[in-house]
Amino acid sequence: MEKGINQRKTEHIRLCLTGNVEGVNKSTGLEGINFIHNALPEIDFADISLESSFLGKQLKAPFLVSSMTGGSELATKINQNLAIAAEEKGWALAIGSTRAFLESDQHKESFLIRNQAPTAPLIVNIGAVQLNYGYGPEECQRIIDKTNADSIVLHLNSLQEAVQDGGDLNFKDLLPKIEQVCKQVKAPVGVKEVGFGIDGEVARRLYDAGISYIDVAGAGGTSWSQVEKLRSKDPLNKAAAEAFNNWGTPTKDCLVSVRGELPEAPLVASGGMKTGVDAAKAITIGADVVGFARHLLKAAMETPEDVIRTMEQLELELKMTMFGIGAVNLEELKNTSRVSIMGQSLMDK
């Protein structure tokens, strides 16, 4: 096992920390959104509230530690540091693919982090494609029970699997199997991409199948075609991956598309999120929760305190943004007219 899934997880972490793994000339699209400064905000900064909720639990901020890793010695340190920090700051917390945990108890501590985060909304994760490779509702429920998680998210990563040496490529007829997971698992089931994005048409099909929430995981941050290109030992795969160095739908476009199709669905924005200003922009165009992944990874390699400092900076940046437009809570931020999208001010409407 150490030379299989677990080794791959360690390689992924190392490459995300040290490699050139962002898409080429690909952004989140959020740079096209600008806030219109309010010189007279008429609020007290001390009154600004970031309180939110997700999966039926209260959050101190509308933030999620997005799925990153699990199933290796290095992942154990990372996930435990993230769990301690998420509990302290009141964030939601997701862990990386739990397939390795279903197959072996090796490095189980990287997944068993509920003790470090007893009250945080906890999400476990497995590839949706595994529903075509022997996994089903029973395995999904088992991993929820083993980790005492609040939810499971199925990740859609077709292009990553295509580029990955030995990837699982049978994505045929997954939707009815996803629907069965939603019907049989006794917890909310979400779906996320891994950095290439989910649009409104796909989100509608998933939501109609019973999915509880959508994480768009758009382009503009880590490109898994580039991560797998750096890992690949196959010259043909490596060369082909280069053609996909700017593949994917930008996070901003995903949010607009999904929110337009599903006005009421719980929506997570992730993919290239680096600042609290990014988060504010995402919330303004439809996100309920904002996920951060690689932006937290370097700190998670150190200590929980390092992660907490990074989290506190993101929270402060979000509060400063809200102060700058006179929004005292997230509802006011969502409904603000003090935003310009691609040069079109909502204040003019």
Swiss-Prot record:
Belongs to the IPP isomerase type 2 family. The lineage of its organism: Bacteria, Bacillati, Bacillota, Bacilli, Bacillales. It catalyses: isopentenyl diphosphate = dimethylallyl diphosphate. Keywords: Cytoplasm, Flavoprotein, FMN, Isomerase, Isoprene biosynthesis, Magnesium, Metal-binding, NADP. It comes from the Bacteria. Coiled coil: none annotated. Involved in the biosynthesis of isoprenoids. Catalyzes the 1,3-allylic rearrangement of the homoallylic substrate isopentenyl (IPP) to its allylic isomer, dimethylallyl diphosphate (DMAPP). Mg(2+) binds at E161. This is Isopentenyl-diphosphate delta-isomerase. It is an enzyme of class 5 (isomerase).
